[in-house]
């Protein structure tokens, strides 16, 4: 520590370099997540959904044999597929953020860094 409780200039410079590096890598990660397609499907594979790494819905595929299912079963399958895609997307995003920050606990909103 330098005088007056301030870190020395070298430490401060390194901290700024690290922050800039994280910022640049965060933009790359954002672009990567945006271009990802993560699939979720119902257990019977009648419904498949894809969402981006940013958790935006991309598309839905319905098996042509679904017409034999009743309304409640179809609704259950849709919800199941969405939940699985969302869970995979969330896990992927957390893993990539953890890689980006080198395990630093940044307490970013929406990302519980202690889940990993």
Curated annotation (Swiss-Prot):
GO MF assignments: DNA binding
GO CC annotations, alphabetized: bacterial nucleoid; cytosol
Keywords assigned: Cytoplasm, DNA-binding
Assembly description: Homodimer.
InterPro entries recorded: YbaB-like_sf, YbaB/EbfC
Presence of keyword Lipid biosynthesis: no
Name of this protein: Nucleoid-associated protein PMM0020
Pfam families listed in its UniProt record: YbaB_DNA_bd (PF02575)
NCBIfam families found in the cross-reference section: DNA_YbaB_EbfC
Region listing for Disordered, in residue ranges: 87-116
UniProt record similarity statement: Belongs to the YbaB/EbfC family.
Organism: Prochlorococcus marinus subsp. pastoris (strain CCMP1986 / NIES-2087 / MED4)
Role description: Binds to DNA and alters its conformation. May be involved in regulation of gene expression, nucleoid organization and DNA protection.
Span of the signal peptide: none
Composition skew (Low complexity), residue ranges: 99-116
Subcellular location: Cytoplasm, Nucleoid
